[in-house]
A protein has these predicted regions:
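N-terminal signal-anchor transmembrane helix
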Residues: 1-11, 191
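Catalytic core of membrane glycerolipid acyltransferases/transacylases, capturing the structured
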Residues: 9-66, 72
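Residue-level preference for the first positions of well-ordered beta-strands
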Residues: 12-14, 81-87, 117
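Hydrophobic/aromatic ligand-binding patch that stacks against planar heteroaromatic rings
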Residues: 28, 53, 76, 107-111
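A cross-family acyltransferase "interaction/gating" segment
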Residues: 50, 97-165
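Short, hinge-like loop/turn segments at secondary-structure boundaries
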Residues: 55-58, 80, 134-137
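Catalytic-site beta-strand/loop segments enriched in glycine and acidic/polar residues
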Residues: 77-106
Length: 192
């Protein structure tokens, strides 16, 4: 893990990360210097032990069928001064590579008055690929290999940069920032 100091100690923060597996949000939350909030689809809260764990780590249930609920929830949390983790790909990757961001994040980035921190995640896909019902223990349990997990918090910046950008410009900028942070995560992953 690197770049932890890039997460502001106070005030609203939008952390924008790539989404490799179910491990991403809790691991980013554990690595963060602040207690994060993040959205998780409501169906994940049906398994009681898992629900307790992710709720304890800051998960907020949302119904993915109601598109605007998630945006409203994130804006409310930011207005209350919370740091919120978002995965704008919308779902876990099927291939381990970063997917195009959904357009909703552009509206959120434009409306939010906060600090934005790009977050790169590498190796979580190997630990728990989308196609598997259960995690693969080797990336976490075995000695250091290029298959370990790396998390990098990129340089923070103000959401004000998005005020004059159109949707496509915002999406491009966010994707570039998260891709840069992911490069940092891969470097950390290879060092561990």
């Amino acid at each position: 893990m690197s770049g932890r100091h890039n997460v502001p100690k106070t005030g609203p923060v939008l952390l924008v990360a790539n989404h490799e597996s179910h491990f991403d949000p809790p691991l980013v939350g554990i690595c963060s210097p602040r207690q994060l909030r993040y959205l998780a689809r409501s169906t994940l809260f049906k398994l009681k032990p898992f629900a307790w764990t992710i709720r304890t780590l800051g998960a907020v249930p949302i119904d993915r069928e109601v598109g605007t609920d998630g945006l409203k929830t994130v804006l409310r949390l930011l207005e209350e001064g919370h740091p919120v983790l978002m995965s704008p790909e919308g779902t876990r990757t099927e291939t381990g590579t970063m997917q195009p961001f959904k357009p909703g994040i552009s509206l959120l980035a434009k409306r939010a008055k906060c600090t934005v921190v790009p977050v790169g995640v590498a190796g979580c896909y190997n630990a728990w690929p989308r196609q598997h019902k259960l995690p693969t223990p080797s990336p976490i349990m075995l000695p250091a290999t290029p298959r370990n997990i790396g998390i990098h918090f990129g340089e923070p910046y103000s959401s004000e940069v998005y005020r004059t950008m159109d949707r496509d410009g915002i999406l491009r900028h966010l994707e570039e920032k998260v891709a840069e942070a992911r490069v940092g995560a891969v470097k950390i992953q290879r060092k561990t």
